[in-house]
């Protein structure tokens, strides 16, 4: 590029100068995050350091392969970043092998399937309606199209995992892989029981700990090891890192298969800037403050659930052992889709969610899913989450009394209280 063709602002102009339209959207999103309460259980707020790593010059570097075994030159420094992420992940989860290249939790699961399954093999995972995940064999997902997917659920009496059903289905269908974990499981999972069931039929055991990995790392939730053959996770959610995935194992033979399954199996060049963000987040998670944070995540979840129950709502399983809960709205006579939108107008962000044995359609639902990681990162404690619960009840009671079209005054009043609460706990003051 000659001086005549070199863009004079390419290396110096800010996004606001080069692309005001895009900058405006990002600025609006920053405002939303600052001014609204984030209760989506799968979301969190990363540190300025993680954002700096992810926005670094590592985004320029192609690095197909693994540290020390790349297909491109000039990888000596990205190797340092990836090795930091790997070593820190192994230390966090007390395991022997970690692949930090998956671009998402879904791709981490896909990598495991690629490594140990063939099309048509039987897998046994949790039913989506009971709290499982799309990648555990749901019909619309690739995992449900490529494999013979069988699903277990929860007991109707208490909405806890039906381990007797898991054993019966495993005995009947002889799966090659059993999956424990999901996207809406508020209680701890008995990994030893899953291991016993897997051993009884000669199956691999995969623990998908995408939602509770941060709790595991901090000792606030039982570890899947030594029971699991392999564990997968996202690196955001409770781990509070950039959006991405990871595969962990103690089995050296499986580790080689997982590495080959990710590259060259399902991915090409890894996202080195994201891996740098993972390394930064894992470094934060190794500090004592992270243990205190995760302890507060759980305490806040207990407080939120307790106050919602006091307000006349039901919590599936009666409470939570983790960061997440499912709120049953049926006692108030309203549905998840209506409540989700009303809370959004009040600047409380949630998602509608089916509950076990839900009589409503998936687009309607009888519940909403709530989580405490993002609010806890912001600095909210138990008293703030009790206040948030009361605000949720205020909106829901308003809907029940006034209907969706007549609830504007209630939502406006709650929106003002949300603004006051968020103002006490500001986000990203330097942005």
From Swiss-Prot:
<dbReference type="GO" id="GO:0005829">
    <property type="term" value="C:cytosol"/>
</dbReference>
<comment type="similarity">
    <text>Belongs to the SHMT family.</text>
</comment>
<dbReference type="InterPro" id="IPR019798">
    <property type="entry name" value="Ser_HO-MeTrfase_PLP_BS"/>
</dbReference>
<keyword id="KW-0554">One-carbon metabolism</keyword>
<keyword id="KW-0028">Amino-acid biosynthesis</keyword>
<dbReference type="InterPro" id="IPR015421">
    <property type="entry name" value="PyrdxlP-dep_Trfase_major"/>
</dbReference>
<keyword id="KW-0963">Cytoplasm</keyword>
<comment type="subunit">
    <text>Homodimer.</text>
</comment>
<dbReference type="InterPro" id="IPR015424">
    <property type="entry name" value="PyrdxlP-dep_Trfase"/>
</dbReference>
<dbReference type="GO" id="GO:0030170">
    <property type="term" value="F:pyridoxal phosphate binding"/>
</dbReference>
<comment type="pathway">
    <text>One-carbon metabolism; tetrahydrofolate interconversion.</text>
</comment>
<keyword id="KW-0808">Transferase</keyword>
<feature type="modified residue" description="N6-(pyridoxal phosphate)lysine">
    <location>
        <position position="237"/>
    </location>
</feature>
<dbReference type="InterPro" id="IPR039429">
    <property type="entry name" value="SHMT-like_dom"/>
</dbReference>
<feature type="site" description="Plays an important role in substrate specificity">
    <location>
        <position position="236"/>
    </location>
</feature>
<feature type="binding site">
    <location>
        <position position="128"/>
    </location>
    <ligand>
        <name>(6S)-5,6,7,8-tetrahydrofolate</name>
    </ligand>
</feature>
<dbReference type="Pfam" id="PF00464">
    <property type="entry name" value="SHMT"/>
</dbReference>
<keyword id="KW-0663">Pyridoxal phosphate</keyword>
<dbReference type="InterPro" id="IPR001085">
    <property type="entry name" value="Ser_HO-MeTrfase"/>
</dbReference>
<dbReference type="GO" id="GO:0004372">
    <property type="term" value="F:glycine hydroxymethyltransferase activity"/>
</dbReference>
<dbReference type="GO" id="GO:0035999">
    <property type="term" value="P:tetrahydrofolate interconversion"/>
</dbReference>
<dbReference type="InterPro" id="IPR049943">
    <property type="entry name" value="Ser_HO-MeTrfase-like"/>
</dbReference>
<dbReference type="InterPro" id="IPR015422">
    <property type="entry name" value="PyrdxlP-dep_Trfase_small"/>
</dbReference>
<dbReference type="GO" id="GO:0019264">
    <property type="term" value="P:glycine biosynthetic process from serine"/>
</dbReference>
<protein>
    <recommendedName>
        <fullName>Serine hydroxymethyltransferase</fullName>
        <ecNumber>2.1.2.1</ecNumber>
    </recommendedName>
</protein>
<comment type="pathway">
    <text>Amino-acid biosynthesis; glycine biosynthesis; glycine from L-serine: step 1/1.</text>
</comment>
<feature type="binding site">
    <location>
        <begin position="132"/>
        <end position="134"/>
    </location>
    <ligand>
        <name>(6S)-5,6,7,8-tetrahydrofolate</name>
    </ligand>
</feature>
<comment type="function">
    <text>Catalyzes the reversible interconversion of serine and glycine with tetrahydrofolate (THF) serving as the one-carbon carrier. This reaction serves as the major source of one-carbon groups required for the biosynthesis of purines, thymidylate, methionine, and other important biomolecules. Also exhibits THF-independent aldolase activity toward beta-hydroxyamino acids, producing glycine and aldehydes, via a retro-aldol mechanism.</text>
</comment>
